[in-house]
Amino acid sequence: MTNGNSKNFEVIRKYFKNGCLNQYDTLLSLLHHRLPYLKNAGIILKLYQSSAIAVTNNSKNIQINSYQANYNHAIAMKNYLEKKISKYVTGVFLHGSLGTNELVQYSDFDALVILNHSTFNSKQSLINVATTLKKSERIMQKMDPLQHHGWFILTEKELEDFPTRYFPPSLFEYAKCLMGNNRFQIHFQNENGADTEDKV
């Protein structure tokens, strides 16, 4: 991923954490949690729309098995997201111990969401998706009250210039698809020789 695109998507991911892009936004959130989302939505839309798709030299077909286990927090998450934002989601994937079905007492909720282009069609859709994902982290915290991270977030545009350092493609091998598309293709740059064996 090019440096310019990488920085843009880092800011976009920061927005999805809590809407805050700077310290002033953090203070603003004390007045109401939605205010930073409202204030910064326009900035995020411009960043997304201005992010160019780079020419990449590797591609990989991804196919992920559907989630078959019946763990109550995973099912609660699926039901919540399907009800609230399913039309904005390309896919939701469980990885870590949830993906391999090797849960232990201290397991946390490791999950990736890939957001489609329609998330970034308007401020309203962007704010809706961002605040819904933030609220859904309550389900993660019910599984693990010490959960130290929320969602891993990617956008549909990033599938064309995949951020391998943020989410190594090898993690898909141990993931399960909770909802959405379980087959897609990613394109990525060589980074220190990483993933060259996946070229198709």
Could you say what each language-model-derived stretch is?
Residues M1, M77, L115, M140-M143, ...:
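Detector for methionine-enriched segments
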Residues M1-F93:
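Helical scaffold of the NTase/Pol beta-like nucleotidyltransferase catalytic core
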Residues H32-H33, H73, H95, H117, ...:
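Histidine (H) residue identity feature
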Residues L45, Q49-A69, K123-Q124, V129-V200:
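Conserved NTP/Mg2+-binding pocket subregion across the NTase superfamily
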Residues M77, L94-S97, K134-S136, E156:
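Sparse, context-dependent recognition of short Cys/His-centered cofactor- or disulfide-binding micro-motifs
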Residues K78-F109, V113-N121:
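Active-site nucleotide-donor binding segment shared across nucleotidyl transfer reactions
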